[in-house]
Amino acid sequence: MGEKLQKILARAGHGSRREIEAIIQQGRVSVDGKVSKLGDRVEVTQSTKIRLDGHLLSIKESEENVCRVLAYYKPEGELCTRNDPEGRPTVFDRLPKLRGSRWVAVGRLDVNTSGLLLFTTDGELANRLMHPSREVEREYAVRVFGQIDDDKIKQLSRGVQLEDGPAAFRTISYQGGEGINQWYNVTLTEGRNREVRRLWEAVGVQVSRLIRVRYGDINLPKGLPRGGWTELDLKATNYLRELVELDVETVSKLPVEKDRRRVKANQIRRAVKRHTEVSGRQVAGRQGSARKGSTRQNVGNAAPAATASRRSGPKKRG
């Protein structure tokens, strides 16, 4: 009977299921030369040819796919888009390159928000984690500017009316601060656009800093620099998969990637060592030639050589 085309493409990392459903509806996907419709089922074999805008896509059979997840520390100023017409930096710029697949972002953070952003090669996993029905908890550290009293905290906990419907924080905990700049940690179970900021603004308080520190039970890794990423191990990856009722993985590419980096590092060290040895032999050869030449010079030439040596020494910093 096969499997729905959008699920196959999502699992292969060609986008989230919602993104893929949109491009199928636009008539941009074909299977074995026939334009596909939303809801089509496909039995993937070695001879199956799926194309997007005429370009052949890499589709592995389900047992060959390995789910990978990255934790990325998004800095402020980066956009959650693959390509920006104005050439501004995006969250995809720093991610490791993939062959035959691509990273799918699990949700979004607005340009002025920093913190934890997950990426995966499994679009179905991304789609389920983002879906409001799953109620996956997100935690944010928020620095707010303004007068805050118990009534406002109660409002935010009970719920306020936003333009796109009612919203509330699941938890609010005070973290300290100075003057009217105060830090709070808040949690939500959905990811509406600018929801944290809009909730605070609804009670007359401005957000001056916003950092996502947790997604489900995955915390922003300690020591990870802004703009840095780390790949989750098999245990953490399977936690996310079980959270949204997907089959667990039995293998991980993480050890393979570590081995590749170790081999690359060893190759670099060997190249540097060879370069040092060659340079050393060349310097020794030049010095030997210079010593032989100096025996044919008279002693009066030593003073100019010493002067030249002093001139070639380190310059004073102005």
UniProtKB/Swiss-Prot annotation:
Pfam families per the UniProt record, alphabetical: PseudoU_synth_2 (PF00849), S4 (PF01479)
Reactions accelerated catalytically: uridine(2605) in 23S rRNA = pseudouridine(2605) in 23S rRNA
Keyword Zinc: no
Region (Disordered): 271-318
GO MF annotations in UniProt: 23S rRNA pseudouridine(2605) synthase activity; RNA binding
NCBIfam families cross-referenced by the UniProt entry: PRK10700.1, pseudouridine synthase
Protein name: Ribosomal large subunit pseudouridine synthase B
UniProt lineage: Bacteria, Pseudomonadati, Pseudomonadota, Gammaproteobacteria, Enterobacterales
